[in-house]
């Protein structure tokens, strides 16, 4: 009877996981279908504004990614991290966003949702190798801006409007392997303990970028005796690229008492990633039409111009990141991690290359993108005097300075973000599954050398709430482990 009771509990927990995954996928795929997840007018240029491919655990730390070794979450931007996962994991998230845009005396607020990535790591418990795969959003357009111009000319007043939609996503497949060493550490005066003191993990990913972005501009003249104008462009992008990563940790010191009980330690983490340049292929269509807008119905009168180009070649820039972290652990379970990370991506090579098509469009120019991140995590003490769910949670916070890959009027789009959140173990589940709750706030705009913002230029205040989940199998499910009867 006890066996059937345990089996029943396990099946209930399994069904809970399946329901949670189904709901998460339903919400996220609904947003993916729309692809309009970036209402910022800055998304007009290029492929749209890039979306961090990081999952909630990394975003809550300001985007720190390359050095973080955490066996209970997936880090899609660091291929080597998969080798350090404790078991097979599935991870995804959704994001609820609010953007407050201001330009001069005009203000506008937009609420929208966006999906996170779908990530999977397949690993045998206790193994040294792992396979990771997933789909993550890369860029998005979703802007809709307009202005009405009043003139004393014969043509009269007219309205200009600009809209964009679509986006790109990246699917990836990777492999990672870790090399570990152990060392005897003294425990008291006459004993010792064998501990892992050093490890190096190597990983590689191959990824495929694809998607379509659409931009449309309209000139609508109020006087119906004049015809109106519409210009639209569609670009379908695809690119095959690679990403390589390395992670290492070194035990700085560890203390054990004469009973061989752990007292405390400090560990250094280091990590780096590199993605080489890759070819970008684009199918482009551009149409310029004369239209007439009557009773909210737009009728095409004439096609003034139509051009299309297949397999136009360009470049995706190289990208690298490097970072480090130090971890302090205590016998009562308290754990503190302090980390820093830097990422750079040189988009100027796109304009300098012999590209057959201008994917940027507009008055902007390419620039060198970068992200500087600082983050920390804290695990409270977990001794018997304080064993509630919060004591077993991980609290995170971070700060990031962003430089975007576009410059306008000679000044680069930049911003800052502050974030915080908590990863909570999934109650009632006999696994290492976690639920992630986080928020992020920041600002984005075009500045000058002294840090001020152009007069009459667009400035955005951003706020985001994140909900994510990392699902792991029941701890007694030895997946990928041969059984006696195999």
Language-model-detected regions and their locations in the chain:
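Bacterial N-terminal signal peptides that target proteins for export
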Residues: 3-19
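Bacterial N-terminal signal peptides
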Residues: 20-28
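Sec/Tat signal peptide C-region and signal peptidase I cleavage site
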Residues: 29-34
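Subset of outer-membrane beta-barrel
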Residues: 35-486
């Amino acid at each position: 009877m006890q066996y059937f009771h345990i089996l029943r509990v396990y099946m209930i927990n399994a069904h809970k996981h399946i329901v949670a995954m189904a709901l998460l996928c339903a919400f996220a795929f609904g947003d993916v279908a729309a692809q309009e997840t970036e209402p910022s007018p800055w998304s007009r240029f290029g492929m749209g504004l890039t979306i961090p491919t990081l999952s909630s655990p990394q975003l809550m730390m300001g985007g720190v990614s390359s050095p973080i070794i955490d066996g209970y979450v997936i880090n899609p931007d660091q291929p080597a991290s998969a080798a350090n996962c404790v078991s097979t994991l599935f991870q995804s998230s959704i994001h609820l966003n609010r953007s407050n845009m201001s330009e001069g005396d005009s203000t506008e607020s937009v609420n929208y949702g966006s999906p996170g990535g779908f990530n999977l790591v397949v690993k045998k418990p206790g193994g040294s190798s792992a396979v990771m795969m997933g789909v993550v959003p890369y860029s998005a357009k979703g802007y809709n801006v307009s202005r009405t111009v009043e003139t004393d000319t014969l043509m009269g007043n007219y309205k200009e409007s600009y809209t964009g939609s679509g986006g790109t996503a990246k699917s990836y497949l990777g492999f990672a392997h870790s090399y570990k060493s152990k060392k005897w550490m003294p425990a008291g005066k006459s004993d010792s303990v064998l501990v892992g003191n050093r490890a190096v993990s190597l990983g590689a990913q191959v990824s495929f970028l694809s998607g379509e972005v659409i931009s449309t501009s309209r000139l609508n003249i109020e006087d119906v005796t004049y015809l109106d104008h519409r210009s639209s462009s569609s670009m379908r992008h695809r690119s095959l690229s690679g990403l390589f990563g390395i992670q290492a940790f070194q035990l700085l010191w560890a203390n054990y008492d004469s009973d061989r009980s752990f007292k405390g330690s400090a560990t250094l983490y280091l990590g780096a990633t590199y993605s080489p340049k890759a070819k970008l292929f684009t199918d482009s269509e551009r149409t310029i039409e004369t239209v007439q807008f009557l009773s909210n119905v737009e009728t095409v009168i004439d096609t003034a111009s139509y051009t299309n180009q297949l397999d136009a070649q360009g470049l995706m820039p190289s990208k690298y990141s490097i970072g480090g972290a130090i971890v302090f652990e205590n016998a009562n379970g308290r754990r503190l991690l302090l980390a820093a990370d830097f990422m750079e991506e040189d988009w100027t090579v796109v304009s300098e290359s012999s590209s057959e098509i201008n994917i940027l469009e507009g008055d902007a120019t390419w620039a060198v993108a970068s992200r500087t991140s600082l983050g920390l995590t804290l695990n409270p003490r977990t001794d018997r005097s304080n064993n509630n769910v919060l004591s077993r949670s991980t609290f995170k916070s971070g700060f990031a300075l962003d430089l975007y890959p576009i410059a306008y009027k000679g000044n680069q789009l930049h911003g800052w973000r502050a974030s915080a959140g908590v990863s909570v173990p999934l109650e009632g589940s006999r696994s290492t599954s976690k639920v992630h709750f986080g928020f992020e706030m920041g600002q984005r705009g075009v500045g000058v050398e002294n840090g001020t913002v152009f007069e009459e230029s667009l400035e955005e205040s951003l706020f985001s709430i994140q909900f994510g989940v990392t699902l792991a199998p029941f701890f007694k499910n030895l997946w990928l482990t041969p059984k006696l009867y195999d």
